[in-house]
Amino acid sequence: MIQESELGKRIKEYRKKRELTLQEMEEKTGLTKGYLSKVENTRRAPPVSTLIVLAKALGISLSEILGETAERNKISLVKKIERQVVARNGTVFGYSYQTLAHKFYKKQMEPYILTLPVKPKQVPFFQHKGEEILFVLEGTMKFFHGDQEFVVEQGDCLYFDASIPHHGICQGKKEVKCLMVIYTPE
């Protein structure tokens, strides 16, 4: 299991190794210095979309931020028992996720199993460059994309522009599990 409390420290180490200031990271990522400082000093995992943006700005893979060693293979098999839980029992952002391709080096896409809890603490909108796919494996959720709202059930699939504010909220008494794939351009 990946320790959430280590992610911020690892990001800070990579930033300092590259001799980048928070101001320079702000310019590279579009995230404010204040937010970046919180990410580096928090004990909770930031949203996966933020981790991807930070990895690209640092010139590393998300796997490296997660502390995993990815192989330079043309194929990667991650067995169910090998999945890495990145944020357990939900985060301050209201969800948890498991990596599905952490063994593949320099991915163009980041696949996860996303779990939305029944009663999240808070659910902010997310917004980042790129595109996402959400395929609902279990449960029902209400999904917001800009000013649009969708009810998405087991077997339904969303493909959307991630630069538009978006988020999902569990509906009903059962958590929602989704296959989530994020593509963020270089």
Q: What label would you give each PLM region?
A:
Residues 80-87, 93-103, 110-128, 162-165:
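Conserved short histidine dyad/triad with adjacent acidic residue
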Residues 15, 25, 47-58, 62-66:
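Hydrophobic micro-packing sites on short alpha-helices
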Residues 9-26:
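Short basic helix-loop element that most often maps to the first helix and adjoining turn
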Residues 30-44:
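Recognition helix of helix-turn-helix/homeodomain-like DNA-binding domains
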Residues 100, 146-161:
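Short acidic-glycine-tyrosine-enriched beta hairpin
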Residues 11, 22, 33-35, 48-51:
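Helix-turn-helix DNA-binding elements, focusing on the entry/boundary residues of the two helices
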Residues 93-96, 153-154, 162-186:
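Ligand-binding loop in jelly-roll beta-barrel domains
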Residues 115-116, 128-143:
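Short, conserved beta-strand element in jelly-roll/cupin
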